[in-house]
Amino acid sequence: MLDNFIAHQATKEFSVSEISNKIKELLENNFGYIKVKGEISGLKIANSGHAYFNLKENTAILACTCWRPILAKITFPLNDGMEVVISGKLSSYAGNSRYQLSVDNLQPTGLGAMLQILNERKAKLEKEGLFNKIRIPIPFLPDKIGVITSITGAVIKDIIHRIRERFPTRIIIWPVSVQGENSGNEIAEAIEGFNNLEEVNKPRVIIVARGGGSIEDLWSFNDEILVRAAYNSKIPIISAVGHEVDYTLIDLAADKRAPTPTAAAEFAVPVRSILNNTLQSYEKILLNNTSRLIKYHEQNIVNYNKIHRYLSHYINNRQQLLDETGFNLLDALPCFIELQETKIKSFSKERVNPAKIINYKTLELTHQTAYLSKSANNTLKNFEYKLELNSTLLASLDYHNVLKRGFAIVKGETGNFLSSKMTAANEKIFNIKFSDGEIKVVRA
């Protein structure tokens, strides 16, 4: 009992604040930065913007505090029951003698929760139009290719090997982490970094690549900041994340999606040997076409020479004919002048003889009179013929003549004309007119 008393007297005494601070130091110094996986429960968001909740597993509970700046960086809604992995530091809160985890980063885990977040994020970005951009064509032979991936692992080796095998070109590697808390930010910064390079150093196409894995492993490629960076890129992007069955949001914002990293390299450059064969084929076609064209024009030149010789001969003949015609004209001109002078003298004599002029005019008047008389007689006969024809037609249409041919006109009691059985159905008295008279008929 005395020993217990002495031991009790030797025990160090602490104040409440001192022991609380000691516990705080013990927790923070021994655990440092940790990751904890669990299920969110009791979530509360204060007016200050800070979030308070418990992270639980079976019956164990860990209090968590997520300060407003950290909460603002989380791109998906927090819900009770959501499985998450939290990174942060352990500390104690002296106000109620409990330890808590101060959240620095929070990522979803568990397939159901992650798919829900993925679908909600996809719907949001799709509504903003980030998946409907005009795709930039992949250049045919890029002189520089940017590759964003992990510097370690098989992916970068496969891409380099495939490009060198198909068509060697300059490869610029921007190493990033392809998995983990800050991976999405690193890849987004790499895309922006390539776009901000000087034009002479800028790649013509960017490959964003990673090998296969679970949805948790590929989660960085669903980051909103990464999708926006891919959408805003002025350099075409080929996404090659996972295997053919794996789909991430960057696939929807990229300009082309490759099923594998190796396929991305094949999309980026053609096969050099195939290009050489194609060029050789085109060269043969060009040579054949050129040869045919030269032969065609050579034949045209031969034909043009023949035409030239023919035209020269034709022109010479025409020139000779023209010369001969000129000589003939010179020989005939004096005779022509003499003939015209004779006609002028004869015409002058006739003009001074009035009797000849009167006889000429009288003869001309006689001819005109005979022509006019004949024309008038022909016109008169034509009118008489038409008059006779119209008179005959008019007589044939006279209803008296029609009655003489056996027809009759039937009228009703009031003198109305009856032209059909229907109009005569209600009549009792009929007046029937023939060519030689009219009779009255009463219906029995």
UniProtKB/Swiss-Prot annotation:
Alphabetical list of Pfam families matching this protein: Exonuc_VII_L, tRNA_anti_2
GO cellular component: cytoplasm; exodeoxyribonuclease VII complex
Top-level class of the enzyme under EC nomenclature: hydrolase
Location (main, coarse): cytoplasm
Keywords assigned by UniProt, alphabetized: Cytoplasm, Exonuclease, Hydrolase, Nuclease
Entry EC no(s): 3.1.11.6
Xref: InterPro entries: Exonuc_VII_L, Exonuc_VII_lsu_C, OB-fold_nuc-bd_dom
PANTHER family membership: EXODEOXYRIBONUCLEASE 7 LARGE SUBUNIT (PTHR30008:SF0)
Biological function: Bidirectionally degrades single-stranded DNA into large acid-insoluble oligonucleotides, which are then degraded further into small acid-soluble oligonucleotides.
Protein's name in the database: Exodeoxyribonuclease 7 large subunit
Organism: Rickettsia conorii (strain ATCC VR-613 / Malish 7)
